[in-house]
UniProtKB/Swiss-Prot annotation:
The lineage of its organism: Bacteria, Bacillati, Bacillota, Bacilli, Lactobacillales. It comes from Streptococcus mutans serotype c (strain ATCC 700610 / UA159). Belongs to the universal ribosomal protein uL16 family. This is Large ribosomal subunit protein uL16. GO terms for molecular function: rRNA binding; structural constituent of ribosome; tRNA binding. Transmembrane segments: none annotated. Keywords: Ribonucleoprotein, Ribosomal protein, RNA-binding, rRNA-binding, tRNA-binding.
Length: 137
């Protein structure tokens, strides 16, 4: 599971998810990629579930790059606790993903296999996605 080794602040502000991703909008390492078309928080568990779905379909062939990292903590109060009395305890880790960001990349597999593997991975994620190919240099 992806988690930061150490953080400066345990509890973070939620922040805004406006606009497009600044960088990481092109396929950089692999041949095919999975690009977000909407913005959302993606948890470390969702990233792991997507990774497992891809690698199992590819039968551990090919190469996978995970281009997002859950560096932001999110908090939650216990069920039945009244409002007030401070911010809740850290609950987990999320990667804020804006539209346009390439989240996963795949190489060394045929296009049909890559397309299906990324389709399976997209079902594990809370964002709408599209399959993209590396542009020829």
């Amino acid at each position: 599971m992806l988690v930061p080794k150490r953080v400066k602040h345990r509890r973070e502000f939620r922040g805004k998810m406006r606009g497009e991703a600044k960088g990481g909008k092109e396929v950089a390492f692999g041949e095919y990629g999975l690009q977000a078309t909407t913005s959302h928080w993606i948890t470390n568990r969702q990233i792991e579930a997507a990774r497992i779905a891809m690698t199992r379909y590819m039968k551990r062939g090919g190469k996978v790059w995970i281009k997002i990292f859950p560096h932001k903590s999110y908090t939650a109060k216990a069920i039945g606790v009244r409002m007030g009395s401070g911010k809740g305890a850290p609950e987990g880790w999320v990667a804020p993903v804006k539209r346009g960001k390439i989240m996963f990349e795949i190489a060394d597999v045929p296009e049909e296999v890559a397309r299906e593997a990324l389709r399976l991975a997209s079902h594990k994620l809370p964002v709408k996605t599209k399959f993209v190919k590396r542009e020829a240099e």
